[in-house]
Regions:
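Short cysteine clusters
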Residues: 26, 30-33, 285, 303, ...
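Glycine/alanine-rich phosphate-binding loops at beta-alpha junctions
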Residues: 87, 93
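Generic structural signal for hydrophobic
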Residues: 96, 123-124, 148-149, 186, ...
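Distinct, well-ordered alpha-helical segments
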Residues: 116-121, 142-150, 205-213
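Cysteine-centered iron-sulfur cluster-binding motifs in ferredoxin-type domains/subunits
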Residues: 21-30, 36, 109
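Core AdoMet radical
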Residues: 17, 38-84, 99-113, 124-141, ...
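Radical SAM enzyme [4Fe-4S]-AdoMet core and its adjacent flexible, acidic
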Residues: 21, 41-46, 63, 152-155, ...
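Flexible mid-to-C-terminal extensions adjoining Fe-S/redox cofactors in radical SAM and related proteins
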Residues: 1-16, 36-72, 305-387
């Protein structure tokens, strides 16, 4: 009977996109990291791990169990209850069964600790490789055979936002190039690839945007997702890097022109940017309804961007449940989730994260549904009228 109920639900329910930040651990120390990942590196034989704000490092004790520095750092965090064990991650997969899901296995750097490779294999076995996206960085990917990994994922995503400036860079110097170097190998064997480019004050120049597009074109990358810069995670610390509406429009126009000439990568706009090209009947913000975040403690969030500078849920209002402890069926059926989903169209077009950040209501949940996203202050009425 349960199997029949699952089949009936999967035939009618929407696809649930879940970005699963499987670990906080990363080998990079990006200033705008939207999940406030912890930086891990080795120096003079010692493994060091940062706080989410990068303000302090501590030494990871040697537990005698071997592995690379990231494996050691993961076990260190697991011993403190800061990240899920492999058994708990498999319990999450159990609790997703019976639903149409698309899992984006992300981080931190998802593949820096080796146990996550097994997690990807198991997720692909249960849900099918086409339901699995991997978002990773060059160094994380470098430790794995491309063909073997390609057999477990439907798409590879990676961040590529151009060369950082010499002064106050938001990314380490080789971050983007190392990501593309590895992604090129996946594209060469036919794996679907998508570059993700947060638009910031540091990459808006048409020359830089052209360089970004042409490097992706030459590497055979299929898609380029233009993203809004969210002041979440460590991005809270650099609000001046967020472009204006006109800067966003100009950047999109530049890349659309290149797309028209070269055909690929295909330019896609993240939900938060689509209304800049005109009104749409479908609500571009699908937070809480079809798009969710899942953090490294198993907490299901109403948006993948609901993370603060400490790498924690941005506010209890965004917390929907814990997938280690409860099934997705139970969480989606809760009074809180049903209430929030019923209100999703109230601020059509507005990004619910920006509405929450800029709203004036005393209640956090109320702010999520306000028409207070500053990007749409001049176009929200038109967009809402098209709904």
């Amino acid at each position: 009977m349960a199997a029949l109920q699952d089949m009936s639900r999967m035939a009618t329910e929407p696809l649930r996109d879940i970005i699963w930040n499987t670990t906080a651990i990363c080998g990079w120390n990006c200033g705008t990291c939207c999940v406030a990942a912890t930086h891990v590196h080795q120096r003079k034989g010692k493994v060091l791990i940062s706080t989410p704000t990068l303000s302090r490092y501590e030494e990871v004790p040697d537990d005698g169990m071997g592995g690379n520095p990231f494996d050691r750092a993961l076990r260190f965090r697991q011993s403190r209850g800061l990240e899920l064990t492999l058994e708990q991650k498999l319990a999450v997969l159990d609790h997703l069964s019976g639903h149409r899901v698309r899992l984006d296995i992300s981080g931190g750097d998802a593949l820096s600790p080796r146990e996550n490779y097994f997690l990807i294999e198991e997720a692909a076995r249960r849900f099918g490789k086409d339901a699995i996206t991997l978002t990773a960085t060059g160094p994380g990917l470098a430790h794995y055979d491309v063909a073997s990994l390609a057999g477990t994922i439907g798409e590879l995503n990676f961040t590529f936002d151009g060369p950082p400036p010499d002064v106050d860079p938001l990314r380490p110097a080789t971050y983007a190039t190392s990501n593309l170097q590895r992604a090129r190998k996946f594209a060469a064997i036919g794996v679907s690839t998508r570059a993700e480019c947060p638009l910031t004050a540091q990459n808006l120049d048409p020359t830089v945007l052209t360089q970004i597009y042409m490097q992706l074109h030459d590497a055979g990358i299929d898609k380029l997702l233009l993203m809004r810069l969210f002041p979440v995670g460590r991005g809270e610390l650099v609000p001046d890097a967020v472009p204006t509406n006109e800067q966003y429009r100009a950047a999109i126009a530049t890349l659309r022109s290149l797309e028209a000439k070269y055909r690929f990568p295909e330019v896609k706009l993240q939900c938060a940017l689509r209304l800049l090209e005109g009104p749409t009947r479908a609500n571009p913000c699908d937070a809480v309804v079809e798009s969710f975040g899942l953090n490294w403690e198993g907490v299901l969030l109403g948006s993948p961007w609901a993370i603060n500078r400490a790498g924690r849920p941005a506010d209890p209002a965004w917390v929907l449940g814990n997938l280690v402890e409860s099934s997705l069926t139970e969480i989606l059926g809760s009074e809180k989730v049903r209430r929030m989903q019923s209100r999703a169209a109230e601020n059509h077009g507005h990004c619910k994260i920006f509405s929450w950040l800029n709203g004036s209501s005393p209640g956090s949940e109320e702010r999520i549904f306000e028409t207070s996203d500053p990007m749409y202050s001049d176009i929200a009425d038109t967009a809402g009228g098209a709904a």
